[in-house]
């Protein structure tokens, strides 16, 4: 994840828009699980992976389309013989990928990337929170720095995050 935030920051400084492709749900046999992320720019995948192979290739093409449309979207890949898209995978599972459009002019995303980097340097816990609805907001929550971003996050969620035993 550290590389992801460093790359977002660098790409934004170069005035490049991005798409963050994240697996939000998976079931059955799939190459990668929920939480896997890949960052895509105008020339394709920059960093991260959502499993490689046909799913990642198709997701990369969809991300390039998202860059042109400048709107976030979601897509479900069905990995079986009866797959309507027939991407050639028969793992037997399903993968849902959320494509979050990141505008390089958005100061909130830059602040999130900078705060994440600072949190890594100081070895502080934080959570990236992505709104998977039409607004596709993004926030970062850290007990040290508070809530940064534009995702609508109830305070009850924030207080429960601080008590979680994971990073």
Regions flagged by a language model, labelled:
Residues 1-167:
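Segments forming oxygen-rich coordination pockets for charged ligands
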């Amino acid at each position: 994840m550290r590389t992801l935030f460093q790359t977002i920051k660098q790409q934004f400084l170069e005035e490049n828009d991005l798409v963050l492709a994240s697996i939000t749900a998976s079931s059955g046999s799939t190459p990668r699980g929920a939480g896997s992320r890949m960052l895509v720019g105008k020339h394709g995948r920059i960093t991260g992976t959502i499993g490689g192979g046909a799913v990642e290739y198709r997701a990369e093409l969809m991300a390039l389309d998202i860059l042109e449309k400048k709107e976030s979207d979601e897509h479900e890949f069905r990995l079986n013989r009866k797959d309507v898209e027939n991407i050639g995978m028969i793992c037997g599972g399903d993968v849902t990928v959320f494509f979050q459009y990141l505008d390089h002019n958005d100061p909130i995303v830059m602040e999130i990337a900078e705060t994440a980097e600072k949190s890594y340097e100081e070895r502080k816990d934080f959570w990236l929170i992505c709104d998977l609805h039409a607004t596709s907001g993004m926030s970062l929550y850290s007990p040290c720095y508070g809530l940064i971003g534009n995702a609508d996050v109830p305070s009850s969620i924030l207080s429960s995050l601080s008590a979680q035993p994971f990073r």
